[in-house]
Amino acid sequence: MAQGCVAIRSTGGICAMDEHPDSTSGSKGYWLYNNNDRYYKSFRHFVGKAEQYERTALHNNVINKVVTQDNSFTRVFDERWSLTLDVPFADNSRSQVSSGTRFATHSFGVGDISVSGFYWLFNPATSKNGNIQVGMGVKFATGNYDYQDYFLNGATGARTLGAVDQSIQLGDGGTGVSLDVNAYYNFTRTFGFYGNFFYLANPRDVNGTPTSTTAPSATKLAVTSDVESVPDQYLIRFGASLAVNKFDFSLGMRDDCLPVRDLFGNSDGFRRPGYIIAAEPGITYRFGNIALYAYVPIAIIRDRTQSVPDIRQTALTGVYTHGDAAFADYVVNVGVTVKF
């Protein structure tokens, strides 16, 4: 879902509403397969909303490249009920500088699998122009949250095996509960509005994965930034769409957020909270039982907010602490949905 070190992972939440119920009236007991491929390159560092231009100028910025493939299998039972299984795969790299020498760490494999049930609130037979779909699901900790690779010491040339950065871990280590709300309203047969809301609550506090290949300092231990947090995340998305023959054109806004504090449980451990507000143009081409689409959110506002360990360290030392995060300029989402 996200665009950089603010490590919001792919969840399949935006792909749940592949077809309006009014387009499937009378169809029961069929399958939808959705393949969504996402790519982004994060390299611009922010502290709050302020970009750290010197990082790119001095070429010591972190560069994340993330490729995620979501495979979603949806069983539509009738005009109102459906069940979705989402299986993500990721291929990630993180390039960073140590003592003037750039090196990269990598991760590859399956992410956190989720299962969600969905229900249209209004009867499609009588609610022709609009409807609201709600869904609840469970995200399982199937992705490796302690994926390891070799880190280079640029000064000595030594390599040390350790956990890769939180932003390229395959999972977060938590069993979470998700809420989806998807809605649309058609003013005409070709023009309408859409909206999506997704929230993932992760009650687990920390997952035990160390944040450094060296022994943590007393300060890190005191503020709990020595281990990775298991954060919540949410998405808000809305816009307008226009149908022209077999094409659907859309333009909207979206807010991807990893909050400072979780809805349930504690918010200890290291995380890079923040949000990205983006403009999102999209296009879908439909033929037969197949739909091809592309969406490219373009970042407008990027904000790396102060984390709980940052706040604690500020209180402990009397020196204001506010960590940074790397963000992308845009994200590319391309995919296909097939009805069986």
Predicted regions and their residues:
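Residues on the lipid-exposed face of transmembrane beta-strands in outer-membrane beta-barrel proteins
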Residues: S23, N35, N71-R75, L85, ...
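Outer-membrane beta-barrel architecture
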Residues: G26-N34, S82-V87, V110-D112, S127-G135, ...
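Outer membrane beta-barrel transmembrane domains
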Residues: F46-A57, L200, D205-F340
